[in-house]
């Protein structure tokens, strides 16, 4: 009798352990693959990419990323977008406006979380930034253009004519320049506006601008960001100050910025994506999110190279990029 009871207890214990193992296995997160398409490689978009990945990992989600870079090619974007939809991924991340537009054109059902998009409504990705009403949501890289212009005028107080170079095909760039024009009225400044179509245009365009303006402003433009070392080589040689739309461009030879932190923007987008996967939200009702705090950054090497002395008032609040 004792032996039988011992056998029953032993069997029960084994079955209990097996049940625990089965329960643990069942509780383990099911691996999920999501798509992530990036328009092109440059520091800002790379930082956003890392922010997305880090945020998803921090949430403890068992996610694998199908990482694709379109190399600024529209046909690549289209092919990547269509393949992601065909794979029936439960979520697609898109970095930069053209990437988001391409994925949105490929599907109106799969949830899309985008970042590095200046204005989602202007880009026709959502019906309203506060109430998207589509399968798209995300984080905006709208930068503080007014504060950037104020910094420019502190660094170059006698400036009368400002130049700007951007890609006219990027809606986000046109949106920022429209803001710049309104803000320039406060200082009674004249604007010299030149556009480029691709990276190859930047060198000649920059050469034609330096010497004709007192300073240059460049927005968060993907073509200019990719060509920033080329632009900076020309402007620094001409001792022409360049105020940039974000920190990566400033670090690549610009003089100063009050910039967007693309890593944090990526983290915001990553957490929004995690909420969607966990069933805590849907793009249709998730408002576009924005960065609320910005830091002034000065490229110390560039300042010395072009002979700009940083006013004491600026040194009190700005951080220096060594």
Map each language-model feature to its residues:
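C-terminal segment of classical bacterial N-terminal signal peptides
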Residues: 15-25
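Short hydrophobic alpha-helices and adjacent helix-cap/hinge residues
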Residues: 2-5, 11, 26-322
């Amino acid at each position: 009798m004792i032996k039988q009871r011992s056998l029953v207890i032993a069997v029960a214990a084994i079955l209990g352990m097996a049940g625990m193992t089965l329960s643990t296995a069942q509780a383990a997160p099911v691996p999920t693959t999501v798509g992530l398409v990036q328009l092109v490689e440059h520091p800002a978009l790379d930082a956003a990419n890392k922010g997305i990945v880090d945020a998803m990992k921090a949430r403890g989600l068992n996610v694998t990323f199908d990482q694709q870079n379109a190399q600024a090619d529209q046909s690549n974007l289209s092919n990547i977008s269509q393949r992601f939809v065909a794979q029936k991924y439960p979520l697609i991340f898109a970095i930069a406006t053209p990437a988001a537009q391409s994925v949105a054109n490929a599907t109106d059902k799969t949830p899309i979380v985008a970042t590095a998009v200046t204005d989602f409504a202007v880009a026709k990705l959502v019906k309203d930034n506060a109430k998207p009403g589509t399968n798209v949501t995300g984080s905006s890289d709208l930068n503080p253009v007014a504060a950037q212009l104020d910094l420019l005028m502190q660094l170059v107080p006698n400036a009368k004519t400002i130049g700007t170079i951007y890609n006219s095909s990027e809606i986000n760039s046109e949106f920022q320049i429209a803001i710049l024009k309104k803000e320039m009225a406060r200082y009674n400044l004249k604007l010299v506006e030149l556009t480029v179509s691709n990276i190859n245009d930047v060198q000649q365009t920059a050469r034609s601008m330096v010497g004709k303006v007192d300073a240059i402003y460049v927005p968060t433009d993907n073509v200019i960001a990719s060509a920033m070392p080329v632009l900076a080589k020309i402007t620094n040689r001409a001792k022409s100050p360049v105020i940039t739309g974000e920190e990566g461009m400033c670090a690549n030879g610009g003089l100063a910025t009050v910039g967007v932190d693309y890593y944090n923007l990526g983290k915001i987008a990553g957490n929004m994506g995690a909420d969607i996967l966990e069933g805590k939200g849907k793009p249709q009702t998730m408002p576009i999110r924005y960065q609320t705090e910005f830091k002034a950054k000065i490229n110390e090497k560039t300042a010395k190279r072009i002979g700009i002395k940083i006013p004491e008032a600026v040194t009190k609040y700005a951080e220096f990029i060594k």
